[in-house]
Amino acid sequence: GFDPEIVDYCLKKNIPVFPGCISPSEVAQAVKRGLKVVKFFPAEQAGGIAMIKAMAAPYQHLKFMPTGGINTGNLKDYLSCDKILCCGGSWMVKGDMIRNGEFDQIQVMVKEAKELADEIRFN
């Protein structure tokens, strides 16, 4: 979420900060502080790319990092939007895979995710 005290502290100490902004009010607070990138979570549950576009409309410079509910089925919707800096998601790597040491499979899945993102962004 957007905690003004944490954001202000980070800005004062020159620490990169990307607060979660789920409402137009939180986006306005971020912009007021000069931030250029915010996180949007939970993306799909909070309205997805349509909500991001609506909140970003008044702020040409603002970019979003959506996470939550993003997967191979909707990644293109996000990465095709110029308001999206990057996307995150646990769909690439499940916690059990890490705990079980399935690093070869993780490598394959991450490579596939990168290839999909590159295809969307650069084609």
Question: Where are the predicted features?
Answer:
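Catalytic cores of alpha/beta
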Residues: S25-R33, I70-C86
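Hydrophobic faces of well-ordered beta-strands that scaffold small-molecule active sites
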Residues: V17-G20, V38-F40, K63-G68, L85-G89
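Glycine-rich phosphate-binding active-site loops on the catalytic face of alpha/beta enzymes
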Residues: G1-I6, K39-G48, K83-Q105
